[in-house]
């Protein structure tokens, strides 16, 4: 009986334990292009893809539709666009021109999110595993390559 009581106490304490803090690179708050708050720590524990882009980048413009369609196909993966190196109006125009409504886009006006992830060129994709690990891919992958990287983030069923 005493062991049962001890076990129950341990289980209760374990249930009250605080969640481990998010890795440093996810400890940020940013604004979406619409002005809503976005917390980076919400990405931890789920597969995610961050797409770092600029409105004036020819490769970013060329791949925007493919990225949008890929996000729709991979609905169990959180996609986030991270725009930088331009003004908010240009970022909004890019999203509007490419009809990108399937996932949020952050206005990284000061480049701080790019810095957190070590991004120095665009386009860059950050593939976020559920354990918080990140793999960066700079350049324009084919649709097949993008699908392969994303499939590696999600468990096989």
Could you tell me what each predicted segment is?
Residues 40-61:
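Short active-site neighborhood of thiol/selenol oxidoreductases, capturing the structured segment around
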Residues 61-98, 109-113:
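Structural microenvironment flanking redox-active thiols in thiol-disulfide oxidoreductases
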Residues 96-102, 109-153:
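Thiol/disulfide oxidoreductase modules built on the thioredoxin-like
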């Amino acid at each position: 009986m005493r062991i049962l009581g001890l076990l129950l106490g341990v289980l209760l304490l374990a249930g009250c334990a605080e969640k481990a803090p998010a890795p440093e690179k996810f400890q940020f708050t940013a604004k979406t292009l619409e002005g809503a708050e976005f917390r980076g720590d919400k990405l931890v524990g789920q597969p995610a893809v961050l797409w770092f882009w600029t409105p004036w980048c020819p490769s970013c413009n060329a791949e925007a539709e493919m990225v949008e369609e890929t996000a729709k196909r991979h609905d169990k993966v959180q996609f986030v666009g991270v725009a930088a190196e331009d003004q908010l109006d240009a970022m909004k125009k890019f999203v509007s021109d490419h009809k990108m409504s399937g996932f949020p886009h952050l206005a990284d006006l000061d480049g701080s999110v790019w810095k957190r992830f070590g991004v120095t060129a665009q386009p860059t994709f950050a593939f976020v595993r559920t354990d918080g690990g990140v793999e960066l891919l700079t350049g324009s992958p084919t649709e097949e390559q993008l699908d392969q990287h994303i499939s590696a983030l999600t468990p096989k069923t």
